[in-house]
Design a protein with these regions (language model features):
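Single transmembrane alpha-helix segments in multi-pass membrane proteins
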Residues: 4-57, 83-93, 97, 235-239
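Hydrophobic alpha-helical transmembrane segments
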Residues: 5, 9, 42-46, 63-71, ...
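Hydrophobic alpha-helical segments embedded in the membrane of multi-pass proteins
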Residues: 21-25, 42-46, 203-204, 216-236, ...
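Cytosolic-side transmembrane-helix boundaries in multi-pass membrane proteins
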Residues: 116, 175-182, 186-189, 260-289
């Protein structure tokens, strides 16, 4: 039993890193713009398929698949901001209207993916996968890479937001958009940029997930919910909170498999979210915005 729990904990730490990366990609956008960007799930989907098309169909290196995924995701994210969210803001639409528009966009996008790519999973290969054994505990080089890449990107984004002028502008708009505009910060440019940044981070998460699983038309939904959960559990606008929440979610889901079937993982995830909302409405380390 002890070996099983250690193995599940290792799995949980790895998945927790990916959950944190997913959460970061959505948290950046939500904490800055206040938009409940449900269509962010399309970013994961588009990135996964872009990598598959470049790597598997065109026969190009996986590195180019990553680059293509980021480009496609950034273009799509910016298009959603400029083509849907900004016009709705100009018209004075409520957050509920914007949310419904985002949800409708997601449903339409998934339907188009279903028509174009068919409902069959598309595998993505190209990463050298070997098994690392430490005693009776094992994990693959791909999952180790997922862990390292996820935390490296999270650290990089944290440093960017903390130390650069544009990063401070993003934080200023997220904290007080009216004051930021009074200081000469162009809110619309910041909104567009955070959609690009969040989409780029989301693309990396989407490709890492596709490498471990596969690309399919409904892949965005299983990824967007962990992004929501770690954002609200960790705290809106808190990168450290998202990182901790991702780790907790990954551990909780995987360790529970020692006693429960995989069908209960979603229930556990939302139980954590519900408990966090009741006990810590602002999240573990959030500002409460």
């Amino acid at each position: 039993m002890a070996t099983l729990l250690i193995q599940l904990s290792v799995n949980g730490i790895i998945w927790g890193a990916l959950y944190a990366l997913l959460g970061l990609s959505w948290n950046i956008i939500y904490s800055t713009t206040g938009i409940f960007h449900f269509a962010h799930a399309l970013i994961f989907l588009a990135a996964g398929y872009a990598a598959v098309l470049i790597t598997m169909n065109a026969g190009l290196p996986l590195a180019l698949g990553f680059i293509a995924a980021i480009i496609v995701a950034v273009v799509l994210g910016c298009a959603l901001e400029r083509g849907i969210y900004r016009p709705l803001r100009i018209l004075g639409a409520s957050q509920m209207v914007i949310f419904v528009a985002s949800l409708g966009t997601l449903i339409f996008g998934e339907a188009m993916a279903h028509i174009i790519f068919k409902p069959f999973p598309r595998r993505l290969t190209g990463f050298p996968v070997d098994t690392i054994n430490i005693g009776e505990i094992n994990f693959t080089t791909l999952r180790l890479a997922t862990l390292v890449i996820s935390y490296f990107v999270i650290f990089g984004v944290w440093q960017y937001l903390k130390r650069t002028k544009s990063g401070k502008a993003i934080r200023a708009v997220g904290s007080n958009p009216e004051m930021a505009e009074a200081l000469g910060i162009d809110k619309n440019k910041v909104f567009l940029f955070v959609f690009a940044l969040g989409s780029a981070v989301g693309a990396l998460a989407g490709v890492l997930y596709t490498l471990d699983s596969a690309a399919h038309p409904q892949m965005g939904m299983p990824l967007i919910f962990p992004a929501f959960i770690v954002t609200f559990v960790g705290g809106i606008g808190s990168i450290l909170g998202v990182t901790v929440a991702g780790l907790l979610l990954g551990l909780a889901e995987n360790i529970s498999l020692a006693w429960l079937d995989t069908d209960y993982m979603v229930m556990i995830s939302f139980a954590i979210l519900l408990a966090a909302i009741i006990l810590r409405p602002r999240g573990l380390l959030g500002s409460g915005r």
